Amino acid sequence: MGNIHIQTKSKEYDVYVGKESLSHLTTIVQNMQPSVSNIMIISDEAVASLHLQTVVDALQIDQKVFSFVVPSGEKEKSFENFYAAHTSALENKLDRNSLIVALGGGMIGDLAGFVAASFMRGIRFVQVPTTLLAHDSAVGGKVAINHPLGKNMIGAFHQPEAVVYHTPFLQSLPEKEWRSGYAEVIKHALIGDVKLYHWLKEEVQTLADLRDEKLIHILTKAIPVKANIVAQDETEKGVRAHLNFGHTLGHALEKELGYGNITHGDGVAVGMLFAIFLSEQVYKVNLAYEEMKQWFLKYGYPKMPSDLSVERLVGLMKQDKKANAGTIHMVLMQEYGVVNVVSISDETVHIALEAFQKDMV
């Protein structure tokens, strides 16, 4: 098992990664000061049916433990469920010394974290991720819900007390969720750990290789990339925006295709390829785009849909949180391991997207 220490200006905490990580949960709760009064576990139907009782049983404590379960899917990261969670918290007498446990993937981590950030102006929470994708979202304190006009538009920065990454929970994931999470692993490697990138190319020939010791190795290498960036820039005023590599187009694809019709990781994978495609033009460098494209396709990542309106995508990219005064800002790659946030004109993005779309056919 590998423990990773996270340090930000507002909080320090540990990420527990391994096959026995859940055994730490009781100790984590018992060591909190002031003492935890009661616990609310927030989960979704799919995860709760598999793992909720396991977590309840692992909590060897006297305090009351209750659960709030929402339907599964990104569209459930909504104001309605956020409000309903607050109602449940009030009905079950949560107070300022209570604890919320986020049991699930990124959707649940975001929703539960934002409930924790806002209930009585902020209470403690612990992340218990159940997906590979959540290795990214569970660390760093960004919590949010979606608005019909944009993803993660209503939220806060609220760091967890701990992250308990119990890897056996991941074994029930369908292949599309392994692929989705692996995209964020690739992202961390490309922007911050070139050695990990080369290791992935050698050691992960198929998604089935993302298991056991290789999985733990990947998590203990990818999470520190994010941790190091968050330590420098907790509230995304500077370098933390580098973590959005691939997300400008990725989020636009999610919005245009409809949440749930493309996974977050599939969108980010297409977005990273486009960022590399555009970076070669902007920086006049060779980033081996063709080789990267074939590598991504090998894992089953989708191509850019040929029937999507480039004009609509450009409009959605202008709604991205990095956009400034209506100008698109994208994270582009100067070389492997070196990225920058760059202002790009609508025309440049439009021309590049059209060329990229044709190349992906």
Swiss-Prot record:
What GO cellular component entries does it have?
cytoplasm
Database matches in Gene3D superfamilies: 3.40.50.1970, Dehydroquinate synthase-like - alpha domain
Q: How is the cofactor bound?
A: Binds 1 divalent metal cation per subunit. Can use either Co(2+) or Zn(2+).
Q: What is its EC number?
A: 4.2.3.4
In the record, biological process GO terms are: amino acid biosynthetic process; aromatic amino acid family biosynthetic process; chorismate biosynthetic process
Q: Which cofactor does it need?
A: Co(2+); Zn(2+); NAD(+)
Q: What class of enzyme is it?
A: lyase
Q: Which reaction does it catalyse?
A: 7-phospho-2-dehydro-3-deoxy-D-arabino-heptonate = 3-dehydroquinate + phosphate
Cystine residue pairs: none
Location relative to the cell: Cytoplasm
Tell me the keywords, alphabetical order. Amino-acid biosynthesis, Aromatic amino acid biosynthesis, Cobalt, Cytoplasm, Lyase, Metal-binding, NAD, Nucleotide-binding, Zinc
Source superkingdom: Bacteria
InterPro entries assigned: Dehydroquinate_synthase, DHQ_synth_AroB, DHQ_synth_fam, DHQS/DOIS_N, DHQS_C
Subcellular location, principal = cytoplasm
| Pathway in which the depicted protein is active | Metabolic intermediate biosynthesis; chorismate biosynthesis; chorismate from D-erythrose 4-phosphate and phosphoenolpyruvate: step 2/7
Renumbered to this chain, the signal peptide range is none
Q: In which residues is Zn(2+) bound?
A: E184, H247, H264
Show the PANTHER family listed in the entry: 3-DEHYDROQUINATE SYNTHASE, 3-DEHYDROQUINATE SYNTHASE, CHLOROPLASTIC
Family in the record: Belongs to the sugar phosphate cyclases superfamily. Dehydroquinate synthase family.
Q: In UniProt terms, what function does this protein have? A: Catalyzes the conversion of 3-deoxy-D-arabino-heptulosonate 7-phosphate (DAHP) to dehydroquinate (DHQ).
**Name of the protein:** 3-dehydroquinate synthase
